[in-house]
Amino acid sequence: MSTTAYPDTILIIDFGSQVTQLIARRVREANVYCEIVPFQSADEAFKRLQPKGVILSGSPHSTTDIGSPRAPQAIFDAGIPVLGICYGEQTMCAQLGGNVESGHDREFGRAFLDVQEDSPLFAGIWAKGTRHQVWMSHGDRVTSLPDGFTIIGTSPNAPYAVIADEKRKYYGVQFHPEVVHTPDGAKLLQNFVHRIVGVKPGWTMGAYREQAVEAIRKQVGSGKVICALSGGVDSSVAALLAHEAVGDQLTCILVDHGLMRKDEVQQVVEMFREHYNLPLILVDASDRFIGALEGESDPEKKRKTIGRLFIEVFEEEARKLGGADFLVQGTLYPDVIESVSFTGGPSVTIKSHHNVGGLPERMKMQLVEPLRELFKDEVRLLGKELGLPDSFIGRHPFPGPGLAIRCPGGVTREKLEILREADAIYLDEIRKAGLYDAIWQAFAVLLPVQTVGVMGDGRTYEFVCALRAVTSVDGMTADFYHYDMNFLGNAATRIINEVRGINRVVYDVTSKPPGTIEWE
């Protein structure tokens, strides 16, 4: 029997591709549960999850290099469908007796694929003899096939662009179906999980709610639970799930660390105490947090300090309650992914998430993380399932470390107050322009830079404020929002006129990658 809560699971083995997370998004959009695991732990994960099918990701590695990553032999011995994408196709061929070579013509970017044969992979999408746009990114290519495989699609520089062993249900594609630049890619992945693997589209937020509630009850038993409530969508959905699961065993704790947006603490208290009747304790720890952060400019130290203080405060409040056994957090799947290295060797961490890397090892409570398998848009769907209003579900993401990581350089009360006012004006302008729901995340950043200005007849020397706005689906990739210049001019004018301490406003036009959404 499978040890996962989801018997119909697709396992995605990550060989280090930058877009592996997009494979998971496409599979989830097909209402099928999947998990990403790094190739180093794929053997253990395969035994634990007992998946119905496996997808092998792309990779920056070359299959021809000595010691390059390989898929566990167990997946080929299990008699289940396997789809190899780019490097995944190449390692599957190499492991099953085919041949892969380097040094041939490379393909990067848009390419056109000619369908040579009909296949369940193409059913209802592509027909034999047709040509379709795909997105390629490869230097190596397959030069001979293992026994049982046939060519079902070709491109000018990839004669083995799509291959299939229909009997064993092994498929390989040299292109990337998970990216939007392959227009039919999502449908091809749906065909793999629905038609070929045979998994029905049963992964819904209604089903997840039932399973999550049951999992919380099983983990917690009769123990006391406290929930880290911030008022953001993630912690709020986690709190409502926990309350549905264990009722009066739960006490929510809202820590006012002095790093929240304008009026946010009061709004959260009113909503959860009065509307949802959740037991809520408000802890004013702003002096403690800001004192610990004062003068600290290293962003990693900021995050870890905030994570450590969060846990200290929760433990103290738990003792006041007579002890607590469990701590609920709104950790999401991207938090987990970004805090783990999938590329082998020493871990390369993008940045510590205060929910993950910032936690001290000797925490005295066990973590309950009911959302750690979900992407952000799935959390919003779950919030809707739980009855949260659309106006709340649609709120922009706000980081746990709060304004501290939107204030590069040393943190002071004065700088936080300046930033808080500028941010409130910016968001007000966005709402008045009717743009709030079109933007994934928008916020102000107070830079550790002062510039000369002129106000009235006097010279000023004040801070620079950067405005940030991005569009995204799940936070894994993002593009900057393309405002009308009149909007930016109006927002900048209001901020400079109404916020004492700022005399210059700039707009951030960096996408993710290469940047991250937050500045720190």
Curated annotation (Swiss-Prot):
Q: Where does ATP bind?
A: S230, G231, G232, V233, D234, S235, S236
The pathway entry for this protein reads as:
Purine metabolism; GMP biosynthesis; GMP from XMP (L-Gln route): step 1/1
The protein's annotated catalytic reaction(s) are:
XMP + L-glutamine + ATP + H2O = GMP + L-glutamate + AMP + diphosphate + 2 H(+)
Write down the EC number. Answer: 6.3.5.2
Active site positions:
C86 (nucleophile), H176, E178
Domain of life, per lineage = Bacteria
Entry-linked Pfam families: GATase, GMP_synt_C, NAD_synthase
Q: Name one GO molecular function term.
A: ATP binding
A Gene Ontology cellular component where this protein is annotated is: cytosol
- All copies of the GMPS ATP-PPase domain together span 203-395
What is the documented function of this protein?
Answer: Catalyzes the synthesis of GMP from XMP.
- Provide the protein name: GMP synthase [glutamine-hydrolyzing]
Q: What organism is listed for this UniProt entry?
A: Brucella melitensis biotype 2 (strain ATCC 23457)
What are the top taxonomic ranks of the organism?
Bacteria, Pseudomonadati, Pseudomonadota, Alphaproteobacteria, Hyphomicrobiales
